[in-house]
Amino acid sequence: EDKFVGTFWGEIDVLPGLKFKSSYGFDLAFWGKDGYEFPYFLANQGKDVTQSSVWSEMNRGYKWQVENVLTYNKTFAGNHNLTVVLGQSAQRYTYRQLGGSDYDLLENDPSKANINSAIADRDDERVYGGTGGYNNASLASYFGRIDYNYAERYMIQATVRRDGSSRFGPSHKWAVFA
């Protein structure tokens, strides 16, 4: 398996008490599996493999996320503390898979066990000539939060979030969570 993960971000003070932060992250992964089986016989077990076989599978996944957040902090009249957060987030995940198998290897040599060296009849129903898959998902969000406290003793918080997802039902692509 090979995996590459990274995050980049930056933050600036826009005005006194107002900050803007933007970040981008990614996760890229490649993985797979290969296998082979040569003929063998287990005496009195009834578990014989009379033909060689080989299989291979490759997978790739990619995810990215971007987030932008404005944060406002203000203390007034000595004991009143207010924080307001507004933000936007988006992410996407994509996955691809490709696989296949074959039978009747030309040689029983592990170093030569690959699908190209198998000669099973193409009409053989066991031959898994190839399959693939593709999946993706997206999520977009807008969110806000207000925090207020008096003298760091009495606190109240309100949060709202609106998400849109490719995985939500066809007539309900967006929802509000509070």
Q: Where are the regions that the model predicts?
A:
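Surface-exposed loop/turn segments flanking beta-strands in extracellular/periplasmic regions
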Residues: E1, G35-S52, R96-G129
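Long, low-complexity, repeat-rich, intrinsically disordered, solvent-exposed domains used
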Residues: T83-G87
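Surface-exposed extracellular loop regions of Gram-negative outer-membrane beta-barrel proteins
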Residues: D2-F76, A137-A178
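Flexible beta-alpha connector loops of hexameric P-loop NTPases
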Residues: G132-G133
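Histidine-centered active-site/metal-ligand motif
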Residues: H80
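Glycine-rich, aromatic-flanked loop segments that form ligand/cofactor-binding clefts
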Residues: A90-T94
